[in-house]
Amino acid sequence: MKEKISKKEYNALIRKTGEKHFDGEKEEYGDGTVGLWTYELRKYKLKPPVKVKYVTQEEFGEFKDATNQRLTKIENALVAQGEQIRAQGEQLSQLIKVVLLQGEQIKSQGEQIKS
């Protein structure tokens, strides 16, 4: 796995393997690197530093607003599902009461038939 290095380390490595160590022939390697100094980078499994893309406050604000809207939609959907589940639970409890009453009625009818 390749590791990122700081710009300072990258420049030091290039200085260390500068022009006096470069043989002038461009050797291409399988990973797309060219030249001797890139061999050093590959040898130590280092990656050149990547340029960081900075965002403006406005872009960040837009991203934040979009994320908040998405989260609000998800929250509203979950609240609606919770209400549905609560209503179904109440219906189930009513059905259980009805079934228990019917069970008692059947029991009493069975006792009447036996006697």
Curated annotation (Swiss-Prot):
Pfam annotation, one family: DUF16
InterPro entries documented for this protein: DUF16
UniProt cross-references to SUPFAM superfamilies, sorted A to Z: MPN010-like
Entry's family note: Belongs to the UPF0134 family.
Protein name: UPF0134 protein MPN_283
